[in-house]
From Swiss-Prot:
Pfam families: Neurochondrin (PF05536). InterPro entries: ARM-like (IPR011989), ARM-type_fold (IPR016024), Neurochondrin (IPR008709). This is Neurochondrin homolog. The lineage of its organism: Eukaryota, Metazoa, Ecdysozoa, Arthropoda, Hexapoda. The gene is Neurochondrin. It comes from the Eukaryota. Strongly up-regulated in Mhc mutants suggesting a role in muscle function.
Length: 723
């Protein structure tokens, strides 16, 4: 009590001695003056808060049963004025009574109206001040989230009532804290809010336009992306953002305007994808983005001190994100560029990535590479990520420098992968860390076929990390329903089977893509490093993983491409490790059945309009660009495996596959069987005949003679019937 000023002590004593609400209210005018004075410290405010008693302040805020000598608004105004001062102290702003008053404060701001007379607007302003102070501390933030403050504030801003900027700043403060969980599953409030801000940004020609860019970026990045994308029909805010950002890119602007615009563009591309850049069905905006991103990267990374470059981390990360989206889209060959545009684009990108490479090389040799500062670490991740995106497309340039830098890039990528694994194994708070290794996989596909790069990869035991990554992403793609506690099983028996959430489905899609890239790299390793594939413990573990997990994979259209990749990877590994395979190994038996199913189901005549034409099956047709080469490689590798593991031929016979091939080809019209398909089937059947004495009789019974004649299968004919 000694540090409480004397006037404050006297006032507190007076308040405690009051015998009626009227007396207490009269004393409050003295409190108002005191708490706003410079002499009233935190201890003094706490003493006054306790002397008044929160129930009395709340009564002034909400009760209609008050003395008639003042209008209710005056009571409310005095109470809020005092509360605002109290809330400036953390101990009081986080006090249970004040936290419990949040719904009352929200109600006051929700009822605001531009038409309200001035006194009411002062009340609303004070209520916002209280909410802002409460939102500055963790207990208040949690309470605001729980009471639905974000959708309510969104509604206030969308309706454009009084002091809506206060509502907007509260929203930004909260969404920055809570991220995705800020928003309910119903995206209505989110769409309404973004539409209002986007329209304001599009039509505003003052500096506020750029402030709104920053606010839009901060809010957009926290959305429930899958839900928002699936509910975009009828929404016009993507178009407002497109027009607003387009106007900014055309204007003469400085860094103060350009930086928030780039921030918003990068975030919008992250949420809506690259198609947003083609909303007017022209390529101008896309090319402007690419040029601006590349120029900014060159300027910010050009021969500066590393500390200076790292200070621009946020801006550069946005530019990297824009360039990654542009590069990924250009790789799809959907962009029709004139020769001059191609040259300009390539020159811009090459200039930018020469700087990126130079900076990353300096980072790899500087003490900053060991920095424990999360922002520095995140920026290094971002540099490796964007360079990896470029190297996935640029497969020849800068090779000596890249090989030299590759160990550092792998170290960074592997570290980010371990961070993601740890995050998923824990409570999963906040945004998931970005797996730079996953982004690097397409570039590693190229490195896997380059001898020098492959040497670096094996020296740094990257094959072990890639197997770990395959196991990790398979666990995500192979979604299993959460286990039900034993005590609840009976009452939940009739519940429908749970399905993955939209967020989980998005994760599964990313995981499947990673598995395909990982299989590609590991296949190249297996073929190009046969000795390691035969003797290396990592490759033994890899085969074990494939044969145990492929049969478990759900038979769904989404899984077909990873099924094919794992099946063929397994065959390549079986071929190299054939000496170690034990006859009738149960897991190998199950694996080979799953592999036969993949190879068998690719072609048929049942689904053809012409009953004499062999066609790719409907299930495979939509994915055939990804499966065609795999299927031929699978058939070819099966031919290589059979002489080494002859007992596998039993499965081709017992399953009816060998007989099925002959019966199908028998119905195919002469001269219509594609040469590569004919070779694949003929080589396979010939190998079966060579390794298994029972095959001849089965094929002859199925009328293999006619098939050999019709489709000119000379080699198979000789094996079955002699010359």
């Amino acid at each position: 009590m000694t540090d409480v000023p004397e006037p404050v002590r006297k006032c507190a004593s007076l308040l405690k001695g009051t015998k009626s609400d009227t007396e207490k209210f009269a004393a409050l005018f003295m409190v108002t003056k005191l708490v706003k004075g410079k002499d009233c410290n935190a201890a003094g405010k706490k003493l006054l808060f306790e002397a008044i008693g929160f129930p009395f302040l709340k009564k002034l805020l909400v009760s209609k049963d008050l003395p008639n000598d003042c209008p209710p608004l005056v009571y409310k105004s005095v109470a809020l004025s005092i509360l605002t001062c109290f809330c400036q102290e953390e101990e009081l702003a986080t006090h249970k009574d004040i936290i419990d008053a949040i719904p009352t404060l929200l109600e006051i701001v929700e009822q605001a109206d531009d038409e309200d007379y001035e006194d009411n607007l002062i009340v609303v302003s004070e209520a916002y001040s209280c909410l802002k102070s409460i939102a500055s501390h963790e207990p208040g933030q949690q309470a605001l989230l729980a009471t639905g403050a974000i959708p309510k504030m969104s509604q206030i801003y969308s309706a454009q009532s009084f002091q809506t900027d206060e509502a907007l700043h509260l929203i930004v403060l909260l969404v920055k804290q809570f991220g995705v969980v800020s928003w309910p599953e119903d995206p209505t409030a989110f769409h309404a809010l973004i539409q209002r801000i986007a329209l304001d940004m599009e039509t505003d020609d003052t500096e506020r336009k750029y402030e709104l860019c920053r606010i839009l970026a901060d809010i957009l990045i926290t959305c429930r992306r899958e839900i928002v994308i699936n509910s975009l029909e009828g929404q016009i805010w993507p178009e407002s953002l497109f027009k607003g950002c387009g106007d900014i890119l055309k204007a003469k602007i400085g860094p103060k305007q350009r930086d928030p615009a780039l921030h918003l563009i990068a975030t919008t591309l992250h949420v809506l994808g690259i198609q947003w850049a083609f909303m007017d069905e022209q390529k101008t905006f896309f090319l402007q983005l690419l040029q601006l991103g590349a120029i900014e990267v060159r300027m910010q990374m050009d021969e500066k001190k590393l500390e200076t470059t790292f200070k621009q981390a946020e801006l550069l990360t946005c530019c990297f994100s824009i360039l990654e989206h542009c590069i990924e889209y250009m790789a799809t060959d959907q962009l029709d560029l004139e020769p001059k545009e191609k040259q300009t684009t390539y020159t811009a990108l090459k200039g930018a990535f020469n700087q990126v490479l130079a900076v990353l090389t300096r980072v790899s040799q500087d003490k900053i590479r060991e920095s424990s500062n999360p922002k520095d670490k995140k920026f290094v991740f971002a540099i490796v990520k964007v360079l990896s995106a470029w190297l996935a497309q640029e497969t020849t340039a800068m090779r000596p420098a890249i090989y030299k830098l590759l160990p550092f890039m792998l170290k960074v990528a592997n570290e980010s992968f371990q961070e993601l694994k740890t995050w998923r194994a824990g409570t999963r708070e906040g945004e998931p860390p970005i797996d730079v290794l996953r982004i690097m996989l397409p570039a590693l596909c190229h490195f896997a076929v380059e001898e020098e790069a492959r040497r670096v990869l094996f020296t740094h035991k990257q094959d072990e990390v890639l197997l770990e990554s395959l196991e990790f992403y398979f666990s995500i793609a192979h979604w299993k329903r959460p286990p039900i506690p034993r005590a609840e099983r009976l009452k939940r028996m009739n519940e429908p089977d749970p399905v993955p959430t939209p967020e989980q489905q998005a994760e599964m899609k990313v995981a499947r893509s990673a598995i395909v890239a990982l299989c590609n790299i590991l296949m190249n390793f297996t073929v190009l490093e046969p000795k390691k594939a035969e003797d290396g413990p990592t490759f033994a573990n890899l085969l074990k993983f494939v044969v145990e997990n492929l049969p478990e994979l759900k038979d769904t259209p989404d899984n077909l491409v990873i099924h094919g990749n794992l099946a063929v990877l397994g065959l390549l590994l079986l071929k190299q490790q054939s000496k170690k395979v034990k006859q009738n190994d149960f897991s190998i038996c199950r694996y080979i059945q799953a592999t036969i199913r993949f190879l068998w189901d690719a072609y048929n005549i049942d689904e053809s309009n012409d009953p004499t034409a062999l066609v790719v099956s409907i299930a495979y047709k939509g994915y055939w660009s990804d499966l065609s080469e795999l299927w031929f490689l699978g058939m070819q590798t099966m031919c290589g495996v059979l002489p080494l593991v002859p007992w596998l031929s039993e499965f081709a016979l017992e399953s009816g596959w060998a007989e099925g091939i002959v019966k199908t080809l028998k119905k195919v019209k002469i001269g219509t069987l594609p040469a590569n398909v004919k070779s694949a089937y003929e080589d396979f059947l010939s190998q079966l005949v060579d390794v298994n004495g029972d095959v001849q009789a089965v094929l002859k019974k199925a009328d293999a003679l006619r098939v050999c004649r019709n489709h000119r299968m000379m080699d198979l004919g000789k094996k079955l019937f002699g010359d």
